[in-house]
């Protein structure tokens, strides 16, 4: 399955779709891991995984190990904003490991390459 990778930089965020053949290098990585951008066609860039969501829209959570899906009682943080003080709710989260069920991966640029992102992804945005 193809991944949608959101790449955030200080100036701008861009989204690109990664082919299934290229995305094999991302399977098994967890939130907080850094990887070389050449895996997804961004040579010279170094990216850090900050989150994502699965095929049903459930967010990945750093504190949930593995690629499983759980229902957790939360009072704030990732995936839930309480309306009143002390309010808690049971929410579904995806684990912190990238698997075939993940659709969107959020990343942030750690090291920039020689070419700007817009130049590398120019053909994809048109």
From Swiss-Prot:
- UniProt keywords, alphabetically: Ribonucleoprotein, Ribosomal protein
One Pfam match, by short name?
Ribosomal_S6e
Q: Name one GO molecular function term.
A: structural constituent of ribosome
Per the UniProt entry, what are the Gene Ontology biological process annotations, in alphabetical order? translation
Q: What SMART domains has UniProt attached to this entry?
A: Ribosomal_S6e
Note the coiled coil stretches, chain numbering: none
The record's listing under InterPro entries reads:
Ribosomal_eS6, Ribosomal_eS6_arc, Ribosomal_eS6_CS
Family, per entry: Belongs to the eukaryotic ribosomal protein eS6 family.
Return the protein name: Small ribosomal subunit protein eS6
Q: Which gene encodes it?
A: rps6e
């Amino acid at each position: 399955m193809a991944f949608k990778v959101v790449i955030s930089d200080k100036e701008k965020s861009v989204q690109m779709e990664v082919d299934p053949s290229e995305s094999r290098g991302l399977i098994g990585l967890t939130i907080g891991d850094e990887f070389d951008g050449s895996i997804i066609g961004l040579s010279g860039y170094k990216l850090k995984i900050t989150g994502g969501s699965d095929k049903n829209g459930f967010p990945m959570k750093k504190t949930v190990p593995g690629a499983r899906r759980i229902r957790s009682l939360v009072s704030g943080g990732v995936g839930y904003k309480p309306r009143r003080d002390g309010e808690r709710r049971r929410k579904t989260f995806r684990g912190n490991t990238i698997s075939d069920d993940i659709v969107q991966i959020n990343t942030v640029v750690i090291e920039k390459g020689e070419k700007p992102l817009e130049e590398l992804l120019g053909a994809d945005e048109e």
